[in-house]
């Protein structure tokens, strides 16, 4: 059975994605996070947690993953200051392998 998300949850997920992208560009000072791109955010229905999907352009995924996990509290506190929510969702960072798969398929198709 498909789980339907409400318009509010989708809207908040998009707001979180935009704010995290902005935070990564402006406030993080770690150069290893400069190649991180937020691809999608899926918030739970009760907005207690959010899965943040990301890709990496420069650094290795194994280097960036623990840094993002460690900085999730920092990102959550910054989001609580900018978003007008009663409770800010807990953030879980997940590597988005779908975008890499799509790029690989495009590369293979261009060779044909």
UniProtKB/Swiss-Prot annotation:
Subcellular compartments: Cytoplasm
Tagged with keyword S-adenosyl-L-methionine: no
GO molecular function, one term: ribosomal small subunit binding
Family: Belongs to the RbfA family.
Keyword Cytoplasm carried by entry: yes
Protein known as: Ribosome-binding factor A
Signal peptide as annotated in the record: none
Listed GO biological process terms: maturation of SSU-rRNA
Quaternary state and interactors: Monomer. Binds 30S ribosomal subunits, but not 50S ribosomal subunits or 70S ribosomes.
InterPro entries in UniProt: KH_dom-like_a/b (IPR015946), RbfA (IPR000238), RbfA_dom_sf (IPR023799), Ribosome-bd_factorA_CS (IPR020053)
Predominant cellular place of this UniProt entry's protein: cytoplasm
Protein function: One of several proteins that assist in the late maturation steps of the functional core of the 30S ribosomal subunit. Associates with free 30S ribosomal subunits (but not with 30S subunits that are part of 70S ribosomes or polysomes). Required for efficient processing of 16S rRNA. May interact with the 5'-terminal helix region of 16S rRNA.
Organism expressing this protein natively: Ruthia magnifica subsp. Calyptogena magnifica
Any one of the GO CC terms: cytosol
Keywords annotated in UniProt: Cytoplasm, Ribosome biogenesis
């Amino acid at each position: 059975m498909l789980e339907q998300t409400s318009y509010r949850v989708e809207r908040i997920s998009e707001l979180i994605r935009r704010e995290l992208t902005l935070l990564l560009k402006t406030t993080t000072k770690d150069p290893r996070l400069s190649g991180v791109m937020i691809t999608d955010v899926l918030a739970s229905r009760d907005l207690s947690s959010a899965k943040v999907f990301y890709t990496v352009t420069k650094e290795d995924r194994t280097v960036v993953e623990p840094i993002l996990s460690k900085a999730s509290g920092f990102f959550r506190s910054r989001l609580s200051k900018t978003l007008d929510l009663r409770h800010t969702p807990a953030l879980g960072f997940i590597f988005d392998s779908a975008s890499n798969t799509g790029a690989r398929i495009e590369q293979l198709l261009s060779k044909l």
